[in-house]
Amino acid sequence: MNSLNVKLMNNTPTIVVHPYIKRSRGSKEILLEEAIKLVQAINLNCIYSSLVGIDSINPKTYLKSGYVIFLKQKVIDLSAELIFLNT
């Protein structure tokens, strides 16, 4: 990435999403917080973050359509320019 791209992305309004498998006992909140810190470390502006439970990993339907519609509305409402999907 060249310096022009870095300047253009500086402070970009970003939504951070961390999907997790519902049956897992992992610390999903810690992983979401880590994703937010990563976004901030590369000078993006986290304006919203969310955990989303998934039943299983399926590349065809990773996120359910209802959540995609919800996420689309968040992008519109918050004028987000980037979604960071922490997978």
Spell out what each predicted region is.
Residues M1-T87:
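N-terminal accessory targeting/assembly segments
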